[in-house]
A protein has these predicted regions:
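N-terminal Rossmann-like FAD-binding beta1-loop-alpha1 element of flavoenzymes
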Residues: 26-56
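Glycine-rich FAD pyrophosphate-binding loop
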Residues: 46-72
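Conserved FAD-binding subdomain of flavin-dependent enzymes
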Residues: 66-69, 74-106
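Mobile amphipathic helical/loop "lid" adjacent to a hydrophobic cofactor/ligand pocket
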Residues: 96-97, 101-220
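Helix-loop-beta segment of a Rossmann-like dinucleotide-binding subdomain
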Residues: 168-182, 210-257
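Helical element adjacent to the flavin cofactor pocket in flavoenzyme catalytic cores
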Residues: 227-302
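C-terminal segments that line or cap access tunnels to active or ligand-binding sites in enzymes
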Residues: 300-302, 307-482
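Active-site-proximal substrate-binding core of FAD-dependent oxidoreductases
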Residues: 474-497
């Protein structure tokens, strides 16, 4: 029997000669960026390439990237990416896998303010809300839910494709595989144009759709239709966050991936060829980065960039690439998060009696006189939420604006306040239609995640881009072309069932 056990592998190798010609796995992979994209990339790369590969995550600041918290009087509050949609399956999987807890949604009444008055105010009675919506907007709200659901249904095909190990070498191919020409149209026209063509009223677009764009992306209805639809999904019910802060997902994924975190700012990447005696030359990437002890570097088989490229973001020089890696026009939009512990000046919003004001979330229409995009009562990351209660006279309010609020503006919004914390972000792309995407494959084994943000920026989009990049890197390394850029995948997978 021992002899037979030794013979079996030899017989299998003879029957499957291709097994012997499989390329060895990479020995070292670098991920640039420790936000949700980079941490998810490390997690998925470990899954695909196995235990033997060395994984380095290069992060210039704290893990979490644009997922961050601010401390206000001893409690921490979400200051960056705050909410997760119930259909965000990667984020749901991460939270379950890492044993994290879900913070319940904060339930407070909302209103839409146009700079002079509230054009819509929620009631605590759902029946009254239904009548109000019908009176103001007819069937537009119901039709919008169906319109967004149709787009999300197509987009959710990505989970099946990725579950079956399929990857895409460009963002355009990925999106076309999900939604065909419908998605291409949504990327090439504004949300205003897309919804007008779909028969939505201008009043509804101005008073409901535009405020959703402003709270989620700090921009109006000139953003492309695709990101607009994602933004509308971001104001639906069932949104949640991670207890203790969404950034816990990032540190948890990196720990789970057994990746080594190297604190440093990447300054350049250069292709290198190492010649081995009697063997084929080995192609590597030399990554140079700044640390607290000076300039240093290392070489890697594969590099995944999970930080937005650009002079104000990840300002990386690509040296001696042939052809050269071009600069991508990649402007990001500035959003200022201001957390204020204080009493809202309700008279600014037309309520002379503070006792009569019951709103805990205020969205705004597009009015050049308005210096805020939205404001709302928030709970600490470790709290159980407001549970639908009315805001307390003194609460912590989160204000989104495009510019830092002046003292005069704060005094207009609040009758009194104890503390103010400010966090400026280059939070998401400055969107414009038609949208152009940077490539995913920058060089043979050099990949770029953040281009998918130009379709829509969200935690889940970063996780999807991360899994796609990990699958793509794996298939390209091992020459599995049948798993890359397959046409009509939706139909193919249906017939496999």
């Amino acid at each position: 029997m021992p002899g037979l056990r030794r013979l079996l592998p030899l017989l299998l190798a003879a029957l499957c000669p291709s097994a012997l010609s499989l390329r060895h796995g990479p020995s070292k992979i670098a991920v640039v960026g420790g936000g949700i994209g980079g941490s998810a990339a490390a997690y998925f790369l470990r899954q695909k390439f196995g235990r033997s590969v060395q994984l380095h995550v290069l992060e210039k600041a704290a893990l979490g990237g644009r997922l961050d918290t601010l401390d206000v009087e001893g409690d921490s509050y979400e200051a960056g990416g705050s909410v997760i949609h119930p259909l965000n399956l990667h984020m749901k999987h991460f939270v379950k896998e890492l044993g994290l807890s879900v913070a319940p949604p904060q339930g407070s009444l909302a209103g839409v303010y146009n700079g002079e008055e509230f054009v819509f105010e929620e009631s605590s009675w759902s029946f009254i809300n239904l009548l109000k919506l019908l009176w103001h907007y007819g069937l537009n709200p119901l039709r919008m839910s169906m319109w967004v659901e149709d787009i999300l249904d197509k987009f959710m095909r990505i989970y099946r494709f990725q579950m079956h190990d399929y990857a895409f070498s460009s963002n355009e191919r990925l999106l076309h595989a999900l939604g065909g020409d419908d998605f291409t149209r949504l990327l090439n026209q504004t949300i205003d144009e897309a919804m007008q063509q779909a028969g939505f009223s201008q009043k509804f677009i101005n008073q409901v759709v535009c405020p959703a764009m402003r709270v989620n992306y700090g921009q109006g209805v000139t953003i492309p239709g695709f990101v607009g639809a994602v933004s509308l999904a971001g104001v639906q019910s069932g949104l949640w966050s991670v207890k203790g802060g969404n950034k816990l997902v990032c540190s948890g994924l990196i720990y789970s991936a057994k990746a080594e975190v190297i604190p440093g700012t990447v300054v350049s990447i250069e292709p290198k060829t190492r010649h081995k005696r009697g063997g084929d030359p080995v192609k590597l990437y030399e990554v140079t980065y700044n640390t607290s002890s000076g300039l240093t570097g290392d070489t890697y088989d594969i590099v995944v960039i999970a930080a937005p490229l650009g002079r104000k973001m990840a300002n990386i020089t690509f040296r001696n690439f042939d052809p050269p890696i071009p600069e991508f026009p990649n402007p990001y939009h500035q959003t200022i998060t201001t957390l204020v512990h204080g009493r809202l000046n309700t008279s600014f919003f037309g309520y002379q009696d503070p006792q009569a004001f019951h709103l805990g979330a205020i969205f705004t229409t597009d009015n050049p006189k308005l210096f805020i995009n939205s404001l709302g009562v928030v709970s600490p990351t470790g709290d159980t939420g407001t549970g639908g209660k009315l805001p307390l006279p003194s609460a912590v309010w989160k204000v989104f604006s495009n510019e830092e609020l002046t003292k005069e503006q704060l005094n207009l919004l609040f009758s009194s306040y104890d503390s103010v914390k400010v966090k400026p972000w280059l939070a998401y792309p400055q969107y414009s239609a038609p949208e152009k995407f940077p490539p995913i494959v920058l060089h043979e084994q050099l990949y770029y995640l953040n281009g998918l943000e130009r379709a829509a920026s969200a935690m889940e989009m970063s996780a999807i881009a991360a899994r796609n990049a990990a699958l793509l890197a794996f298939h390209r390394w091992h020459g599995h072309s049948a798993r890359v850029d397959q046409e009509d995948l939706h139909e193919k997978l249906k017939t496999e069932l």
